[in-house]
């Protein structure tokens, strides 16, 4: 049994990383356990996305059609739970032309939540209601019940911990976007807004869930991605490539005192770690 990084596309491998042509066309992809998810824009007048749930051989098991533009995708460590985030338009409360919709699918039972905004949200300990609540960037714990995500309201972002069984979520910390839970379940990698405006607004950080201490990683470029853990000490993420409209996958140790960023794969996106030959 061996593990290898996987991406939704790739033309140039660096330092031994490999890619293969699967025949899939995905705007976002993620694989874990015995499942993968491929979310792709669906041609048509209205904004639609196909969420294709795949088995380990990347055969389609189930397809869900939802409204919006692909943004994020995640699968729980076991492969049972699948989540996605889409950009949507038309919300009257939105300060810009877009807001988000996040959904969760239980592949074992078929239970589908197309919009997690029905969660009972507790903001800083108090039950919270507001029409502008948006969730994105879901990441699952290994019990297929607990999850983390970003929630935004009144111009602020928060890390939330959610419970699927009770359908409740509570905020843990401000200024956390696109969380990614470490394989050992003790840390969250996330992008933190470090400056206002559209130019280089984010920097990757790692949050210790036990101490709530956050540490920036050695990557100083602005990363607009939901980083993936390749192991307990390495993150992978996409950055814009040299050609317009392309991206490359980079890695960085979570220990800021270790080596700096390294190019893993050119012309690729949506990194994830899969186990081959198991």
What residue ranges belong to the model's regions?
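Sequence signature of WD/YWTD-type beta-propeller architectures
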Residues: 1-278
